Regions:
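Mature, structured domains of secreted/extracytosolic soluble proteins
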Residues: 1-538
């Protein structure tokens, strides 16, 4: 880094950030920060000031020394394909950090909260009525979040600071097709002839959840793309979710907030993508208020495993194959030297949620941080994976940590054997078709499996790569012995705790594969009869 915003393109680590071919022989390139891009946009004056005033703008800068050191450490591996893992994937020798901001426009603040429109002095490049704006922001944010430090916007207990933090994600993504969410195998969707260049003929909602940057408490931002291509934040929907349903959205519990891929003002488009981050205008106030809390109490949270690793999005790796060094991910800790981590994208005939999957081989031992749920309560934790004879056996240990750093367990240790087709061999699991899609019989079969700690895959996704709409018999739920969900633990979760799962290999074969497709956090609701709450099959 030459100056505040200028990078030396002769450094090898920078090649990962900017396509040098587009720059000719220019040795340096100006790389404006997200804050500077906001200052250039006439409708983002308040947010530009907020990032400066709260200190979050400075926190959104990459650790240049760490990233350069990483690239120097692994530059000899660039372009290599490790051949000791059983599959051939390119070594990921470069890593970038990234951030995403969802930002209300000045007019949205004015309309929804009565915040004065900023009076901007072009000569000094400052807002002359900032104190009046700050007063209203303090009042409005204090209605949503506790405001223990109302006078200091940089304090983590200040309501405005919390408001800003809950608009930020610790990964850089674009609101473009197959970025924030991934289209691959959802119900009714067909990729077209080339599975690596999926079609945009969307059929049902696709979504994922991301933990916001607020460090004190877990708030999950739900990003949904509807079949018309629009993106919404915290949209909670009703669906045609019966056994023979189509999962088409039939209504909304909360419509959510429309978010935009680019910032267009009076016919002019302002750049919203910086070197290491981006911002996206939103059409209403984003707040994690009581309405959000109410919706999340009964929300089944299903996340692609790649979402738990922020660097996947920041380095635009979804839908790609990659091999990772052990120190690549910020949410993986205590990784043993013999842990081999790969990302694979779906091939024709595979059954994967959203197309991506992680494979871990070797004598692996690592700890994965998983998000706390934003509502205190009892949750059932599950993972989805594919079963075959190449799969691994692992010991899973569940660790939690309070704000003071004290550690405890949040579940009993569990041995996960992904090579054992339990549901196929025990004679209990039956296909819906074999039960004639009878609602009662299928529900009873699901319940019998669940008591054993297993579940069929969701009906939501199907076999990949077909160019015609898949038949109901090709859904993941129509179980062919190759996919399942395993209940890992049932435990109380607090939004103010940190949660981890330690995975340890119990294999003799170094190429035995730990397969990680998706993870689910499901509230343990019970009805008046005491029977476990039966969620929909999707």
């Amino acid at each position: 880094m030459v100056g505040d915003d200028t990078y030396d393109m002769t450094d090898i680590w920078e090649i990962a950030f900017v396509d040098k071919a587009t720059l000719g022989s220019t040795p340096q390139v100006t790389a404006p920060s997200v804050v500077k891009l906001l200052k250039q946009a006439p409708n983002m004056r308040i947010w530009a000031k907020l990032l400066d005033a709260t200190g979050w703008g400075a926190k959104m800068m990459p650790d240049a020394k760490a990233e350069k050191a990483f690239a120097e450490k692994y530059k000899a591996y660039a372009g290599r394909y490790p051949n000791n893992t059983g599959t051939r994937t390119p070594f990921q020798a470069y890593r970038r950090q990234g951030f995403t901001l969802f930002a209300e426009t000045d007019k949205v603040f004015n309309k929804e909260w009565g915040v004065p429109m900023p009076i901007y002095d072009e000569a000094t490049q400052s807002i002359t009525n900032w104190e009046a704006i700050k007063q209203v922001l303090n009042e409005q944010c204090g209605k949503i979040y506790s405001n223990l430090k109302p006078g200091d916007l940089t304090d983590k207990e200040n309501a405005v600071n919390i408001f800003v933090a809950t608009h930020l994600l610790n990964s850089n993504m674009q609101l473009a097709n197959n970025s924030a969410v991934r289209h691959a195998t959802e119900y009714g969707y067909t990729t077209g002839e080339n599975i690596n260049e999926p079609s945009t003929n969307y059929t049902v909602n696709v979504w994922d959840y991301y933990r916001t940057a607020w460090p004190q408490e877990s708030k999950l931002l739900k990003i949904t793309q509807t079949p018309d291509g629009q993106f919404y934040l915290n949209r909670f929907s009703k669906y045609d979710n019966g056994l023979k349903g189509t999962y088409v959205e039939t209504g909304t519990l909360q419509e959510g907030i429309l978010a935009h891929a680019r910032n267009e003002v009076d016919g002019s488009v302002y750049n919203n993508v910086a070197l290491y981050g981006s911002y996206h205008p939103i059409d209403n106030i984003l707040s994690f208020n009581s309405d959000y809390a109410s919706a999340m109490k009964s929300e089944r949270v299903r996340m692609d495993f790649t979402t738990l690793l922020p660097e996947i999005a920041s380095n635009n790796l979804r839908g790609k194959d990659a091999y990772f060094p052990t120190d690549y991910f910020s949410t993986l800790t205590n990784v043993s030297a013999d842990t081999k981590i790969q990302l694979l994208y779906v091939r024709k005939g595979w059954v994967d949620y959203q197309g991506d999957e992680l494979l871990v081989t070797g004598n692996y031992d690592f700890t994965l941080e998983v998000p706390a749920m934003p509502h205190y309560g009892t949750y059932e934790l599950r993972i989805g994976y594919g079963v075959n004879t190449l799969r691994a056996k692992s010991l899973l240990t569940f660790i939690c940590e309070d704000e003071a750093g004290n550690q405890d367990t949040w579940g009993e240790p569990l041995v996960l054997d992904q090579s054992d087709p339990v549901m196929a061999s025990d004679g209990i699991a039956q296909k819906d078709a074999d039960l004639n899609y009878d609602e009662t019989l299928c529900a009873e079969n699901d319940y019998a499996l669940h008591k054993l700690g297993y579940m069929k895959p969701p009906a939501y996704f199907h076999i990949a790569g077909y160019t015609d709409s898949p038949a109901r018999g090709e859904l993941g739920r129509s179980y062919n012995g190759g996919n399942m969900r395993r209940v890992l633990t049932t435990s109380n979760m607090s939004p103010r705790m940190r949660y981890y799962i330690r995975f340890q290999s119990l294999n003799n074969a170094s190429r035995a594969q730990l397969h990680l497709d998706f993870i689910e956090f499901v509230p343990r609701l019970v009805d008046v009869a005491g029977e476990p709450y039966r969620e929909d099959v999707w």
